[in-house]
Structure formats: C-alpha cells, structure tokens
C-alpha cells in the first residue's frame, strides 16, 4: 500500500519563501521613490526573519518571540498595544507596508526603537585571514 505522504516539503517551503519575497518586492516598489534599494532590502530581510511562519504578517506570537530573543519579554496586552500602534489594517498583525512605515519613522512607536536596539546589539563581522602588518608608528 503506497503512502500519500509528501516528503518534499522543502520544495514547498522554498516556493513559499520565493512567493513571499516577490510579494515583498512588489510592496517595496511602492516605497522606491522614498527609500534607496539597500534600505528596502535590509527591511525586507529583517521582516522575513521576524515573520517565522511566512504568512506576510508579524503576529503576536512572532512579536513575542522577537521580544524574548532580545531579552525584552512582554505580556500579551503589551504586545497587543505595540501592534495596534503600527497596524493600519486592523487585523492585529504588522504587514510589510506597516513595517516600512514604522521603520522610516512615519509612525513612531516603541517597537521601532526596540528593533533599532536589536540591530545595535548585533556584533559586527570580524575580519578574516591574516592580520595586516603594522609598524610602531601605527600604534596609538
């Protein structure tokens, strides 16, 4: 008896990510006149990393995980209030348009400050390879 279980979910996930990325690109195109390509790309990457289930929205659960990741755990009501400050659709989740507006400062919120704080906390990439030669005159 053949099993009808689809073991190729990796392909489905890849397609889902590709579709989400194309949707986010089309939304980012709306902001192309206001922001440069590098900034929009950075926001898209951030949004995709926060949107764990690839639904196109950051919901309460995903925001809770983000806050716990940066050691700022919040209650359900605090998370709900943070989302309400940014949410323009009334769905109770942050879509990519709201995320860009929040990050560009068009809607100031505590969530914007927390996300910027998280970016500052990331370690910069260390140079790899052999260190450059220095002379005594280079020392402070």
UniProtKB/Swiss-Prot annotation:
InterPro entries assigned: AIF-1_EF_pair, AIF1/AIF1L, EF-hand-dom_pair, EF_Hand_1_Ca_BS, EF_hand_dom
Residues the record lists as binding Ca(2+): 51, 53, 55, 57, 62
Gene giving rise to this polypeptide: cbpB
Superkingdom, taxonomy of origin: Eukaryota
Matches recorded under CDD domains: EFh
PANTHER family in alphabetical order: ALLOGRAFT INFLAMMATORY FACTOR-1, CALCIUM-BINDING PROTEIN B
Tagged with keyword Ribonucleoprotein: no
Domain EF-hand: 38-73, 74-109
One GO-annotated biological process of the protein: ruffle assembly
Protein name: Calcium-binding protein B
């Amino acid at each position: 008896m053949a099993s009808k279980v689809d073991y190729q979910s990796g392909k489905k996930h890849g397609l889902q990510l590709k579709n989400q990325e194309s949707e986010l690109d089309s939304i980012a195109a709306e902001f192309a006149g206001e922001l440069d390509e590098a900034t929009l790309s950075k926001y898209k990457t951030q949004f995709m990393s926060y949107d764990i289930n690839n639904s196109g929205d950051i919901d309460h659960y995903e925001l809770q995980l983000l806050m716990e990741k940066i050691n700022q755990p919040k209650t359900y009501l605090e998370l709900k209030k943070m989302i309400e400050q940014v949410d323009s659709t009334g769905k109770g989740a942050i879509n990519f348009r709201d995320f860009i507006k929040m990050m560009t400062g068009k809607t100031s919120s505590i969530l914007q400050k927390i996300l910027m704080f998280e970016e500052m906390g990331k370690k910069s990439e260390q140079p790899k390879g052999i260190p450059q030669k220095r002379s005594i005159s280079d020392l402070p």
